[in-house]
Amino acid sequence: MSKTHLTEQKFSDFALHPKVVEVLEKKGFHNCTPIQALALPLTLAGRDVAGQAQTGTGKTMAFLTSTFHYLLSHPAIADRKVNQPRALIMAPTRELAVQIHADAEPLAEATGLKLGLAYGGDGYDKQLKVLESGVDILIGTTGRLIDYAKQNHINLGAIQVVVLDEADRMYDLGFIKDIRWLFRRMPPANQRLNMLFSATLSYRVRELAFEQMNNAEYIEVEPEQKTGHRIKEELFYPSNEEKMRLLQTLIEEEWPDRAIIFANTKHRCEEIWGHLAADGHRVGLLTGDVAQKKRLRILDEFTRGDLDILVATDVAARGLHIPAVTHVFNYDLPDDCEDYVHRIGRTGRAGASGHSISLACEEYALNLPAIETYIGHSIPVSKYNPDALMTDLPKPLRLTRPRTGNGPRRTGAPRNRRRSG
């Protein structure tokens, strides 16, 4: 992490459990991010927290550190049974649950606390086998958690810590009834430590905190600035006919190390993937109907650098921690203003700089005024020369082979295509 992203507050300044501090130091975490510096004094004192921070500011480590410290510092509930986890971390998507689990593994190995993972799509029996042996911290999505609870594979009567991550996304995906169902099966709010984290603390999220938490403290980091100041924003106005060629020209011109391209529909994402894969780019496709194993493989390949470009719907816009994304392209302007913030928040993370390029086409340009009102500023407009757009483009591929794309590793320099000033 960049030093500009950190505070003077050190993890060692807090009365954290020694094993937790040891893991943090081994992982290179010495100074707190702003959200961690605000949250830890409260959670270590047993206070509930509802936190808002821009994506990529350390929310996950804030609640994991608090959770492990609390469980190590407090005994389990008397007569706790093997199917009763001590902590529950709820996430809106399978990918986010998997990432939280991965981030928690070093802490679990050092402390002896057992982790469990529960998400839909696949792995039912494998996940259940782990749960049957007993877990201390259960991380999962609401649907699979309810499934296990209804079959008595898990019982939430001994929960001591609850974390709700990306709470606003839970509402967007219609999971709020599931969340309330799970909360009703836990001990009362004043008998557990409750943490809620979200990129936005809307009225409905605050209402949930009031319902399910014990007089939570609200903490916010840079709430007045909805888009990161390290993200360069840029806007083009292409015609529908020139839109794809403009995207491909910009990719050749920018030559991003790691880019995510967002579109509003599955069909549009597949179309973009086909054009880029045909042009030799190492590109992956992430939409809602991609099988879970393939989704995780694509994300892993993108994170490792085996893929340079990921084309995605908003299923990937929130919660995913993909480091070192240099560029975000909004091929379609989103219909939801908040999705614009979450999309471009994939870049410029953890103190790094990033570049967001949006295409306001004839179909989605009407979304722009609401987006600019929401973010509080106009997006700088750039012009392009239609005569300079790429024309020597191969016929797009269709999805008749693996979606991760088999384009060759990019070598050499990009083609010399320049846009007008």
From Swiss-Prot:
GO terms, molecular function: ATP binding; ATP hydrolysis activity; RNA binding; RNA helicase activity
SUPFAM superfamilies, per the entry: P-loop containing nucleoside triphosphate hydrolases (SSF52540)
EC numbers: 3.6.4.13
GO annotation, biological process: RNA catabolic process
Lineage: superkingdom: Bacteria
Sequence similarity: Belongs to the DEAD box helicase family. RhlB subfamily.
Role according to the record: DEAD-box RNA helicase involved in RNA degradation. Has RNA-dependent ATPase activity and unwinds double-stranded RNA.
Presence of keyword Hydrolase: yes
Group of enzyme by EC: hydrolase
Domain Helicase ATP-binding: 40-219
Disulfide bonds: none
Region (Disordered) location: 392-421
Primary gene name: rhlB
GO cellular component, one term: cytosol
Protein name: ATP-dependent RNA helicase RhlB
Domain Helicase C-terminal, first and last residues per copy: 245-390
Organism: Shigella boydii serotype 18 (strain CDC 3083-94 / BS512)
Family annotation (PROSITE patterns): DEAD_ATP_HELICASE (PS00039), HELICASE_ATP_BIND_1 (PS51192), HELICASE_CTER (PS51194), Q_MOTIF (PS51195)
Comp. bias (Low complexity): 402-414
Keyword list, A-Z: ATP-binding, Cytoplasm, Helicase, Hydrolase, Nucleotide-binding, RNA-binding
Assembly: Component of the RNA degradosome, which is a multiprotein complex involved in RNA processing and mRNA degradation.
Protein residues bound to ATP: A53, Q54, T55, G56, T57, G58, K59, T60
Main subcellular location of this protein, as a coarse class: cytoplasm
PANTHER family the UniProt entry points to: ATP-DEPENDENT RNA HELICASE RHLB, ATP-DEPENDENT RNA HELICASE RHLE-RELATED
SMART domains: DEXDc, HELICc
Motif residue range(s): Q motif: 9-37
